[in-house]
Amino acid sequence: MNRKDLGELIIDIHKRKPSYGYHRIWKIIVEETGWVISANLVHKVCKILNIKSKAKHYKYKKPGEESVKYENIIGYNWNTSRPFEKVVSDTTSFWFKKKKSDWTFYLDVFNNEIVGSDVRETMYGNGILNHKKAVENMLNNKIKRGYKDQETIVHTDQGIIYSSVSFNNIFNSYKVTRSMSRAGTPTDNPVIESKNGWIKKEMYIDFDINNYNTVQEFINDIIWDNNNYRPSYALKYKTPIEYRTQLGFN
């Protein structure tokens, strides 16, 4: 391996994943080639080639007042020791072939893995069926992977659906405890806010949305990419599934 070969590979990965910074590019190079190189060398070559991530960090708003709907039992403690210990959720809206869609997804705090999801025509974040299918998908995955009898904290904002009695009744037959951010306080749920911000940018930077026939195919690729391909800084540049399987978890 010489710097010319390295530079060509960096350019190729940058074309595929324009949002990736040098750490993620380094991880992909190591995974795809087996080369023993440092992230610092990749950083130097990126600087020479003037290659930079096209994504920017997500900014948070200031905290608001305390909510009375569900107590924020997580507080600032986002530490976890296993999958499905703490799960967060949000809905993001985006345009697909001139139609707006709502994507509700559930993220496992343990390894940033998307463990539940549903996408359909927009109801401006208030689609009852969209939320119902997404949470059922998450709960089914929890059972399928062997965590049925393990307690799960599901943390969300105070959106209309997340606060509704009918939505929360879904959890009655499961070992789930609800937790909510304070009203108007995205900093109470930094994990999902950060992921949502990155996903919204990466879905347009790293994916050619016009190449997909359906919005479901598009979302399926984003989920696969997040869980199986995208190295995560918080996981020491391992992918979510790589991280949990190496620790021996289903």
List the predicted regions and their residue ranges.
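RNase H-like two-metal-ion nuclease catalytic core shared by retroviral integrases
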Residues: 63-65, 156-158, 164-165, 178-201, ...
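C-terminal domain-tail junction helix/linker
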Residues: 168, 172-176, 198-250
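An active-site-proximal beta-strand-loop segment
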Residues: 76, 80-126
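Short small-residue beta-strand/loop micro-motif enriched in glycine and branched aliphatics
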Residues: 113-117, 178-181, 205-206
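Active-site beta-loop-alpha junctions of metal-dependent nucleic acid enzymes
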Residues: 118-148
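Basic, flexible linker segments flanking DNA-binding modules
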Residues: 1-82, 185, 239-247
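Conserved, non-catalytic sequence blocks in retroelement Pol enzymes and Pol-derived host proteins
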Residues: 18-19, 34, 79, 157-158, ...
